[in-house]
Amino acid sequence: MSRPKKAIFYAILAAIVLVALEIGASAFLYAVNKDRIAALPGAPSEPAILLALRTGLSWLLPGSFPDPASYRRMTRLPAGFFAEDAEQGYRANPGRYIFRYSGMRQGKVEHLDAVVTINPDGTRLTGKMPADAARRIFVLGDSYVFGDGVNDQQTFAFLLQTEFPGASVQLHALAGYSWANALVTMQRIKDRIRPGDVVILGYAQYYKERHVAAPARLRSIRDWMASTFPEVELDPKDRVIRARLDTSNRLALDTIPMHCKFDPAYCAGPEPAPDYVDRVSSELLRAIAASTPEKIHLLHMFGAKNDPVLRNLPANVEIVAATPQDFSYVMQDNIMGLDDHGGPYWHYAMYSKLRPVIIAARQ
């Protein structure tokens, strides 16, 4: 065989081997990641062979070969941010904390620090409040509403406190919370809500699986903990709230183990039917609305406009449309790519929707 023919033969052979290796690596990566494909940020940025090699090396030498595309860590300093709560499942301990978000850029780990201050009553700091406020603005919701990823002074609740210095803005929100938690909070604070006060209730379509503590929700917690807090030892005392309809179709609340490790059968169980989840969610909203005669401003942050839960609202509930589609500009920033929560631009966008609503409520 002549040299040119040999060169062509070996080139074709090498190409076939590379294609076979790429196909094999792709199959390997699919088998490893099939349970979390939907949660991945997008298409891979590197050949499957390199990704498979990195995955294999990370198994042999844990932590030595992190994937730059998916490497994210979060640390709360000091430890002890969360505490048990018999009704809510968990709550925040008072104190001043640093939320540290880490990621990889150009092969190096970098981090961003956010200051988080929790008041003695468990609310997040929103700024200087008058001792005798003319009215209170109660804000309830999840990690987006709480302001995961941003400093105390960057949350939309802080911006509202600055805009309305005569009011007292009280931020009752926390990561992982939903309307089930909001109902418990409303039962605790309802006697403090006076005529003229404002209640802001966060909502996103993903709240619904939290309401019923769906198995898919617990599996997402499992995967998130494994990727973001790999060094944290799971505690069997960690619990999440669950709303359900009892045998008489009445709303009931309880708590269940947060981690699949301690109830694997539940995590592997069937998902509740969508219409049941919607019914539970609607009952939660009705119960929250019944806690006060004051208007509740439902801050719709994410999800479809035709969400069944947003139909036939209680008389004292009014939607504040604040999804990304409700803005004429791109406002869905994040924490410099180190976290998916809304950054300062997102919080200002929420503030811009709520400010006129609160002004109108005062008139």
PLM feature spans:
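Histidine-centered active-site loop/cap adjacent to the catalytic His
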Residues: S2-R3, A7-Y10, A25-L29, N334-Q363
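Serine-dependent acyl-ester chemistry module
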Residues: R36, L40-R54, L60, A204-P314, ...
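Alpha-helical scaffolding within the catalytic cores
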Residues: T123-L125, A182-K190, E283-L285
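Conserved SGNH/GDSL esterase-like catalytic core that processes O-acyl groups on lipids
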Residues: F146-W224
